[in-house]
A protein has these predicted regions:
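Conserved SAM/AdoMet-binding glycine-rich loop
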Residues: 57-146
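Glycine-rich anion/phosphate-binding loops
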Residues: 41-51, 108-114, 146-148
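Canonical Radical SAM [4Fe-4S] cluster-binding loop centered on the CxxxCxxC motif
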Residues: 4-47
Length: 148
């Protein structure tokens, strides 16, 4: 398995299989976050993603039905790439029913409503979004890169 850093996920995702599709953070400017300050954002090559899925498929443990995409904001990936990843997951791990990931609020702005519905339909569900505040002035002070 290819992991650029340790496993980062919400506590309730502990029972998932983990698949790195990005590393680092595409924004990496939030005033309060130091976790990715020394890490450059990178997208995992599809060859690595596929090799990791092959490794998961070969493992005898099947006690999960969800895959968690590793990376600070894996949902930043373009729609076509997310669809390709979902297709590979379902082809190699047919027992998997859903896919989770961290997402920034801005990750939803570069996808149409139809694309978001399609992503939901192929299993993307319960994405974890960092919504620290609904106050635009505070978002600017925290360098979040979006407003309320």
């Amino acid at each position: 398995m290819h992991f650029a850093s340790g496993i980062i996920r919400p506590p309730f995702e502990a029972g998932c299989a983990f698949l790195q599709v990005t590393s680092g953070c595409s924004h990496n400017r939030c005033a309060f976050c130091t976790y990715y300050k020394d890490a450059r954002f990178a997208v995992s090559p599809m060859e690595e993603v596929e090799a990791d899925l092959d490794e998961l498929a070969a493992h005898p443990w099947r006690g999960y039905d969800r895959v968690w995409l590793q990376g600070a904001d894996s949902f930043v990936l373009p729609y076509d790439r997310l669809m390709e990843i979902a297709e590979l997951i379902h082809a190699k791990l047919p027992w998997v029913r859903s896919i989770g990931a961290f997402a920034r609020v801005t990750n939803f702005c570069n996808k149409s409503v139809e694309q978001l519905r399609n992503l939901r339909d192929v299993g993307y569900a319960r994405l974890t979004v960092g919504v620290e505040t609904g106050d635009s002035a505070l978002l600017a002070r925290m360098h979040k890169g979006h407003d309320a």
